[in-house]
C-alpha cells in the first residue's frame, strides 16, 4: 500500500508502486526534518522539485549524486539550469513542463501551474499517480482559480497545500483551494511552522476545510500515513 511521510516544511517522501519519491527535498537545512540526508543513500528512485528556491530545491543535487539510478522531475528550464550549473548529464532528468501525464516506470507524473516566484524557471506544482492513488503537491503557491481545473483534470486523492501565509496561501485561503480541488480523501497542510515568518495554527485549516465538507489531515514531521 502506498505511504506518504511528511519530512517537515514542503519535503515529502512518497512510497508508491515500489518506488521511493522525494518531493522538494530540503533535508539538511530543514529544522523540522526528522531524518538525516544519508538515510536516502542509494535508495531513491525519483526526485521532484517544484521550483528552485533553496527551501524546495534543497538537497536535490546531492541526492542525485547519492542515488546514481535516480531521476529528477522538474520544469525543463530548471533541469537545463541544474545540468549546466552542476554538470549533471541531461539523461538524469525527465523533461517536462505544465501539461499532461508523463509515464515514468509505472508512475504517471505531471506538472501544474503555481502562482509564486522562482530563480531560474517558472514555479510549478506536481502530480504523482500510481497504484490507483493520485497525489497533488502544490509547491509554493498563492490561491488561483485554475485550481478548479487541477481538481477536474487530475482528480487527486490527496492535496498537499502550503498554509504558512506570507509567501504562500494562509489557512483560510488554502481551505478555499481545497473547495476548488476537491480531494477525494484528504487535504494535508505543508510549508508552515518551519520558521517564525510562516507560523500558523494548522487547526484553523482543519476547521475551515471541514466547513466546506472536506477532510484535512495534519501530520507531524516524520509521521507517515497509508494512502
Swiss-Prot record:
One of its GO terms (molecular function) is hydrolase activity. It comes from the Archaea. Gene3D superfamilies: Ribonuclease Z/Hydroxyacylglutathione hydrolase-like. The keyword Hydrolase applies. InterPro entries: Metallo-B-lactamas (IPR001279), RibonucZ/Hydroxyglut_hydro (IPR036866), UPF0173 (IPR022877), UPF0173_UPF0282_UlaG_hydrolase (IPR050114). Keywords: Hydrolase. NCBIfam families: PRK00685.1 (NF001911). Belongs to the UPF0173 family. This is UPF0173 metal-dependent hydrolase Saci_1512. It comes from Sulfolobus acidocaldarius (strain ATCC 33909 / DSM 639 / JCM 8929 / NBRC 15157 / NCIMB 11770).
